[in-house]
């Protein structure tokens, strides 16, 4: 385990894809040693990031996701070798019950210039699929959305690449350390430090990138139980 610094500008909790991608991005602004410190309870990619399926796509029904996912794909494309990213594209092959929804996704992709093809009709879909896989046999397919970008990556290798990109820019990743609480300002609720089982690290800002464990930190921070969405 690395030694815990006594202070940092930003402390990030969690060594998965959220924590390390944030660290990498922040390292482009904060360039001094220990400006950005990542605290990880076990090891990088030890949680959900290490068991993710690895598919990289822009195939979500929510319109708000479209440009965000297009940006995400471009990050994967920026260094495919390091990220162990394979840009083979992505296929959504669907029966009639999904036709309308998939057509909506295609329209949204087209509106932002995201390259994809949309094939409709059972006959044309069969022809298209056999053009790629001559032993294709699935019946009842009435739409194929073929994203020309996207593909897949090897999850743990990808997270390791994020760690390497971060640490090469001066980020310190401390592993085997457990966050136990937060230090507050004397006259406010502002967080001024992170308490751990290895001591306290003072900081100006905290980023919680703990994935499914975010509830524990939410409770430590005594934030409201209900969240009202307007």
What are these regions (language model features)?
Residues 27-49:
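Glycine-rich FAD pyrophosphate-binding loop
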Residues 53-132, 141:
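Dinucleotide-binding Rossmann-like beta1-alpha1 core, especially the glycine-rich loop
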